[in-house]
Design a protein with these regions (language model features):
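Conserved PLP-binding catalytic core of the aspartate aminotransferase-like
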Residues: 42, 304-310, 319-353, 363, ...
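Active-site PLP attachment segment
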Residues: 225, 231-266
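PLP-dependent enzyme catalytic core of the Aspartate aminotransferase-like
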Residues: 46-47, 82, 351-352, 363-393
Length: 393
C-alpha cells in the first residue's frame, strides 16, 4: 500500500512538470554537428586514441584512504598543481564531488559564505551542506558583493561582542575564529560570461575574505596553454582554492582542488565526497595525464577556437533583435524566452543537422530561456553559418 502511495505521488509530480513544460528526459547520442558538448578542444577523441596503448585494472578497488591510492595519482596531482601555479592539489571523482566536498567542509559555523547568484548547482549544494551563514550577491555585480562583505563585517562585530561577553562571564578563553568566503565561477556555465575576477580579488583582500574559484569552463580556453583565467590574470597567489575540472575542455572525467598543502590535508580528513567513495580507475587518471601532455605540448593552440568564437559573434550581431549574452568564452547563449518557444527553435536547428540544445526554466530564470551553443576547435565557419540561416527564418 505504501509503495503504491509513493508511486502515485511521484507520478503526480512528474505530470505537473510535463504540464509546465519542465519535464526532463534522457537522450542518446546522435550524428548531428556538435554544438552541445563541453569538448571544446576535441581532446576526448585524441585522448581516446592515446589511451588505447595502455592496459589498467578495471577498478581502483577502494577509496583513496584504503586500497585506491597510488604514487601515479599523487605524482599526477603535483604535476597538475605545478602546471596551474599552485602548491598542490587533490583529485576528486568529478567536478560535482570537488565542489560539494570543498564547500561543505571548509566554511564553519559562524563563518560567512558569499556566493554569486549564478554559481553552479554543485557549488550551491556544497554551500547548503556547510554550517556557514550564506548570502548571495547579484551576478557579477561588484557593488552588490561589497555590500554583502561590509554587512558581513558588521554581523561579525555583533557576534564577537556577544561571544566576548559570554566568555567573560564564564571565565573562558575566546577561541572562535570567523572567516569569510567568496565562491564564484571564472566562466559561468549557463551564460558563458567571465567573472570580474580582478575586482573580486581586490575586494577579497580589502575585507579579508577567502576566494574560491571554479575554473571548469576556463581551463583549456584562457591563460597560457589553457591554464585558466586565474593564471591569465596572474592571480594564482590571491585565490584560496581553485576547482579545475577534467570533463570539459580536457575531454576526460574528474576534477582537482588546487591550493595549499594545509588545504589538501584538510580535505583528505574532512571532505566526505572524497573520503567515502571508491577512487576513479587508473585509466581515468591516465587520460587526465594525457590531456595535460596535450596542453603542455609546444604544438598546443586554441587560436582556431577563439577565431570561431569571434566569427560566431560577428554573425550574431547581424541579426536584428537577436539577444546574445555577452561572452568571449566557448559558451555562447541566445535568449529565446519561453520553454516551448526555446524548445521549438532548438528542434528546428536539430532537424537541419545541428546539435543545439535548449536550456529552459527552472535551470535558468523564467524569461531567460536560451539556446546554449558551445564552440569547438573542430567546428567550421560553414557549420556556424548554418545556425544563423535557421535563426533568420
Amino acid at each position: 500500500m505504501l509503495v503504491k502511495q509513493i508511486e502515485k505521488y511521484l507520478l503526480s509530480i512528474l505530470e505537473e512538470r510535463k504540464q509546465q513544460s519542465l519535464f526532463r528526459s534522457l537522450r542518446t547520442s546522435n550524428n548531428l554537428v556538435d554544438f552541445c558538448s563541453n569538448d571544446y578542444l576535441g581532446f576526448s577523441q585524441k585522448i581516446k586514441q592515446d589511451c588505447e596503448n595502455y592496459s589498467f585494472p578495471s577498478g581502483a578497488t577502494g577509496s583513496r584512504l584504503l586500497a585506491g591510492n597510488t604514487k601515479f595519482i599523487e605524482d599526477l596531482e603535483q604535476e597538475i598543481a605545478n602546471f596551474h601555479g599552485a602548491e598542490t592539489g587533490l583529485i576528486f571523482n568529478s567536478g560535482y564531488d570537488a565542489n560539494v566536498g570543498l564547500l561543505s567542509c571548509i566554511p564553519q559555523k559562524n563563518d560567512i559564505l558569499i556566493t554569486d547568484e549564478l554559481i553552479h548547482a554543485s557549488m550551491i549544494d556544497g554551500a547548503r551542506l556547510s554550517y556557514a551563514t550564506r548570502y548571495k550577491f547579484k551576478h557579477n555585480d561588484i557593488e552588490s558583493l561589497e555590500f554583502r562583505l561590509s554587512n558581513a563585517d558588521l554581523r561579525k562585530d555583533n557576534l564577537m561582542v556577544g561571544i566576548t561577553k559570554s566568555t567573560s562571564e564564564n571565565n573562558s578563553s575566546l577561541e572562535t575564529v570567523f572567516s569569510k568566503f567568496i565562491a564564484i565561477e571564472s566562466v559561468y556555465s549557463m551564460d558563458g560570461d567571465l567573472a570580474n575576477l580582478t575586482s573580486i580579488v581586490n575586494l577579497s583582500e580589502k575585507y579579508g575574505a577567502n576566494l574560491i574559484v571554479d575554473e571548469a569552463h576556463a581551463t583549456g580556453i584562457f591563460g597560457k596553454n589553457g591554464r585558466g583565467l586565474v593564471c591569465e590574470l596572474g592571480l594564482e597567489d590571491k585565490v584560496f582554492a581553485r576547482v579545475v575540472t577534467f570533463g570539459k575542455a580536457l575531454g576526460c572525467h574528474g576534477a582537482i582542488v588546487l591550493g595549499s598543502k594545509n588545504l589538501r590535508d584538510y580535505l583528505v580528513n574532512f571532505a566526505r565526497s572524497f573520503i567515502y567513495t571508491t577512487a576513479a580507475p587508473m585509466h581515468t587518471h591516465e587520460s587526465v595525464r594525457q590531456a595535460y601532455q596535450l596542453l603542455k605540448s609546444p604544438d598546443f593552440s586554441n587560436k582556431k577556437l577563439h577565431h570561431l568564437i569571434h566569427f560566431f559573434k560577428e554573425q550574431a550581431i547581424q541579426i536584428p533583435d537577436l539577444e546574445l549574452i555577452e561572452s568571449i568564452s566557448a559558451i555562447q547563449c541566445i535568449i529565446i524566452s519561453g520553454n516551448e518557444k526555446c524548445r521549438e527553435v532548438a528542434m528546428k536547428l536539430q532537424n537541419t543537422g545541428l546539435d543545439i540544445r535548449p536550456i529552459v526554466s527552472p535551470t535558468v530564470p523564467k524569461g531567460k530561456e536560451r539556446l546554449r551553443i558551445c564552440m569547438h576547435e573542430f567546428n567550421t565557419e560553414e557549420e556556424i553559418l548554418r545556425i544563423f540561416e535557421v535563426l533568420k527564418k
